Amino acid sequence: MFTSTAIKNKKIPRIYIEDDLDLNQFYFLSDENRHYVTKVLRMKIEDILEIFNNTHYIFFAKIIDISKKIIKIQTFKKILKNLESPLHIHLGQVISKNEKMDFTIQKSIEIGVKTITPLFFENDHFQKKRINFSNKIKRWEKIAISACRQCNRNIIPKIKIPMNVFHWCENNQNNDKKIIFHPKSTLTMKCLTEPIKYIQIIIGSERGFFNDEFQKIIKYGFIPIRLGPRILRTETASVVAITALQTMFGDFK
């Protein structure tokens, strides 16, 4: 049996399991996890895994059997580990090109965003082509799990079904603070003086916002704020905005 000291002194690979877990129980890994453990990590019988399952707990498990088709593990330790920020950031990200959108999802999760809704305008190219979002959502969810595995988050942020920007604004008429980041705004982050626990933010895609779009979003109660004097790429803007908010109101203090 591995001691707590042995666990602390060794970097233990993390995997995500959807199942409800309990101590001293046996589980079989999914095909995806089996491939990752055997082909990527090259793990063997008796090696230890750290498991997260979308709760505030992590489990340690020992590999007890490996074959071509199965990996059997047994849990032996459970630890409460809450790394979630007290600031709930809901990112409304206007969908950008594939690799940029992937980057935005990955990095925003690593720095603490809790909910992501991909957004689009009616005249966007993929909307005209009536692209089925199901495959994109599956890809984004995998990116979210991978980001959590890397950064030690145990609660996987929600990636919601893509929505029209204005429908999203209309459906989120609550008491949350709302911000749209725009390089031509005269307001800066310094205008946010009161404590914030829940906030919704909109980040544009590569094309930015047309003036009529910008004005309509403001009418839904979104405060226009700029992120410094420079114009940022869409994937940079999301990281900068979330980092600034985490520094002011979250767990980057």
UniProtKB/Swiss-Prot annotation:
Its EC number is 2.1.1.193. GO terms for biological process: rRNA base methylation. It is found in: Cytoplasm. Keywords: Cytoplasm, Methyltransferase, rRNA processing, S-adenosyl-L-methionine, Transferase. Its main location: cytoplasm. GO terms for molecular function: rRNA (uridine-N3-)-methyltransferase activity. It catalyses: uridine(1498) in 16S rRNA + S-adenosyl-L-methionine = N(3)-methyluridine(1498) in 16S rRNA + S-adenosyl-L-homocysteine + H(+). GO terms for cellular component: cytoplasm. It holds the Pfam family PUA_4. Transmembrane segments: none annotated. SUPFAM superfamilies: alpha/beta knot (SSF75217), PUA domain-like (SSF88697). Specifically methylates the N3 position of the uracil ring of uridine 1498 (m3U1498) in 16S rRNA. Acts on the fully assembled 30S ribosomal subunit. Homodimer. PANTHER family: 16S RRNA (URACIL(1498)-N(3))-METHYLTRANSFERASE, RIBOSOMAL RNA SMALL SUBUNIT METHYLTRANSFERASE E. Belongs to the RNA methyltransferase RsmE family. This is Ribosomal RNA small subunit methyltransferase E.
